[in-house]
Each structure stands twice: as structure tokens, then as C-alpha cells.
Design a protein with these regions (language model features):
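Cytosolic regulatory regions of ion transport systems
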Residues: 1-189
Length: 189
């Protein structure tokens, strides 16, 4: 059984709306906060979400949104400082987890401090994350799929061996010797 979370999303712009749409499709209980009533009403009509019109950094607005009983608050406004303040307020109100969108590279050196001192569960810089993902994919262009897990300590990769590859026809016991890698083969098609 999948656990449906109560999630509050602050900011109904491109990032916030995309998150709201995806999480709504997964069946989570969502409340969206934004100070643009027109955009909020459009989201409310097109998605299965509750909305609160107001400043997401406001204690009263967050209370109205039910942050005190939320599993997660995601602050995805265009303002880094607003996002950080939203998360601080949510944590003080009793929200279990908070995620802040922080785009300014000046804050990169302070992320650990922000997580520890401000009680943030995660800080995300979308542009930096996209650049790192592109770099990661370009490192091994032959991989059809590449996913990290265990906090980046392990990876699952999918690749198709081309004709003439020295691994073709070899027993799996010889994989590490022939490929000269420390890997565990999970499946062969």
C-alpha cells in the first residue's frame, strides 16, 4: 500500500505547478499556497488540490493550510529567502519535513548550515541539479539508463552491448575480470 502524504506547496509558478500536478496524480493530499488568486483558482480547477490565497511565509496562512499536520512543505517560490522563511515557519508549526528551492549560488557553501540550523530536510537548486544530471549522463553516453541510490553510493545502470564487445558470450563469473569494474550484474536480457 502506498502512503499518501499531506503536502503543502508554497508557490504556484512553473515549478510549483509541475510538482503539484505530479503529486496530485499520485494521490497525495495537497494544499497550494500562493498570493496570486487567479493562478490558484486555475490550479484548483484543473487539479485535485485545496488552495490558500496569501503569503506562504505567514504563520496564519500556513496554519490555514494545515502545515501543523503536514508531512511535507515544499517552498518553490521565485525568492530564495522567502522559501527559507517558509520552511522555518513550517518547521516551527510542526511540519515533519521541509524542502526549499534555493537558486542563488552564494548559498551553496551554507547549505549544510541551513539544513542543520534551520531544520530543512532538503535544499534544491534546480539549475545546478539539472547541470549535474546532464554531466552525469554525458560521462557514460552508452548507458541507456542511470540511477543513483543509497545517497549516491550505488548506481543502477542499463546498457546495451554492441557487437564485438568482449563481454558478449562470457560467463557472468568473468564479468569483473573482463570489464575491470567492481559491479554486480542484476539482470541479462
Amino acid at each position: 500500500m502506498i502512503y499518501n502524504m499531506k503536502i503543502v506547496i508554497v508557490g504556484d509558478g512553473k515549478v510549483g505547478y509541475t510538482l503539484t500536478k505530479s503529486l496530485s496524480e499520485e494521490g497525495h493530499d495537497l494544499v497550494v499556497i500562493d498570493n496570486n488568486r487567479r493562478i490558484l483558482l486555475a490550479s484548483q480547477e484543473s487539479l485535485d488540490v485545496a488552495v490558500v490565497d496569501g503569503n506562504g511565509a505567514s504563520v496564519e496562512v500556513q496554519r490555514e493550510a494545515g502545515v501543523d499536520t503536514a508531512d511535507l512543505l515544499i517552498a518553490a517560490t521565485n525568492g530564495d529567502e522567502t522559501n527559507l522563511l517558509c520552511c522555518m515557519v513550517a518547521k516551527k508549526l510542526g511540519c515533519k519535513h521541509t524542502i526549499a528551492r534555493v537558486r542563488n549560488p552564494e548559498y551553496d557553501q551554507q547549505i549544510r548550515f541551513m539544513r542543520e540550523e534551520l531544520g530543512l530536510s532538503m535544499v534544491i537548486n534546480p539549475e545546478k541539479a539539472a547541470a549535474l544530471e546532464i554531466f552525469r549522463l554525458l560521462q557514460f553516453p552508452s548507458f541507456l539508463k542511470r540511477d543513483s541510490f543509497a545517497r549516491g553510493n550505488a548506481e543502477h545502470v542499463e546498457l546495451k552491448l554492441k557487437d564485438g564487445n568482449p563481454l558478449i558470450g562470457k560467463p557472468l563469473q568473468q564479468f569483473r575480470t573482463v570489464a575491470d569494474v567492481n559491479a554486480l550484474v542484476c539482470a541479462v536480457e
